[in-house]
């Protein structure tokens, strides 16, 4: 059985084609195509611009995916699309494309929860069985565990998502959005040496990122770190090296120091709430999914915690961590095989589609 998946909940448009062999063997990725709308440095992406991008590229990506997978329309069994959560305008653009293909090709629709798509793709790629899931992206921050055919949310952000915090700070520093602001912050953080004190807000298994963002934005403004004086910053980086200075703490922090401090603080918060969830459900596995899950420092910190508990951490690379169509095809096919269908009249989008709102019929 073959499913085509369309993802477009934010600025990334993805089309994926997944094969589930009839003999029940491991599913195969036949195509995984993605195109990203990139906004100028210092700016975020607006829903209307992202939707326009998706409308302009979706047909091209579908044709390219079919060619790469070497399948015809007749081979496709179902069309899966992101029903939510996400930004309204881009979600609607992809939903319209999915409905159009359904009518043109005579194939049934399967609406997929974006978060469940991340989880199921992560489970497939890593081989993890029943992990505590840390779902971290630009729009979501949740600690999840499976129970009684639901992906239960044990903890989440109380305000903005961790990825949104990183993206907005990248705008403050006028860091490039290509290939992604969070990735560029990660690379800059590797050069940081001075840890700046920032707010740390954890409440049980929930956390908050708006306060730390406001604090670090204020620090960046007070130090004049707007990304325009790179020569001076390079000198400060040299001064902050212990090999050249004995009073590191007295040196004005650089952009790299602020990125380093932000990552260390927010990732410590994520590790804490994940460990608490592991203790609660008795799991020794952690699966990190979502765009922020690509961050190597987050994976490293989570790995230290998991190993201390006698457990392990699982994560995927950027092909599957970042929003993609293949995860929608995977989750959609799992639902399709249980008899689930989305009638055309119910193929609307839901911006606040909760992870625990999905009945996971395909798991025991």
Curated annotation (Swiss-Prot):
Class of enzymatic activity (EC top level): transferase
Any one GO MF annotation of this record: chromatin DNA binding
Superkingdom of origin organism: Eukaryota
InterPro entries: ATPase_NBD, Gcp-like_dom, KAE1/TsaD, Kae1_archaea_euk
Obligatory cofactor(s): a divalent metal cation
Entry coiled-coil feature ranges: none
GO biological process: positive regulation of transcription by RNA polymerase II; telomere maintenance via recombination; tRNA threonylcarbamoyladenosine modification
Cofactor mode of binding and number, as noted: Binds 1 divalent metal cation per subunit.
Residues annotated to bind a divalent metal cation: 114, 118, 135, 323
GO cellular component, one term: chromatin
Gene3D superfamilies: 3.30.420.40
Stated role: Component of the EKC/KEOPS complex that is required for the formation of a threonylcarbamoyl group on adenosine at position 37 (t(6)A37) in tRNAs that read codons beginning with adenine. The complex is probably involved in the transfer of the threonylcarbamoyl moiety of threonylcarbamoyl-AMP (TC-AMP) to the N6 group of A37. Kae1 likely plays a direct catalytic role in this reaction, but requires other protein(s) of the complex to fulfill this activity. The EKC/KEOPS complex also promotes both telomere uncapping and telomere elongation.
Complex and partners: Component of the EKC/KEOPS complex composed of at least bud32, cgi121, gon7, kae1 and pcc1; the whole complex dimerizes.
PANTHER family linked: TRNA N6-ADENOSINE THREONYLCARBAMOYLTRANSFERASE
Protein name: tRNA N6-adenosine threonylcarbamoyltransferase
Gene source species: Aspergillus clavatus (strain ATCC 1007 / CBS 513.65 / DSM 816 / NCTC 3887 / NRRL 1 / QM 1276 / 107)
Gene encoding the protein: kae1
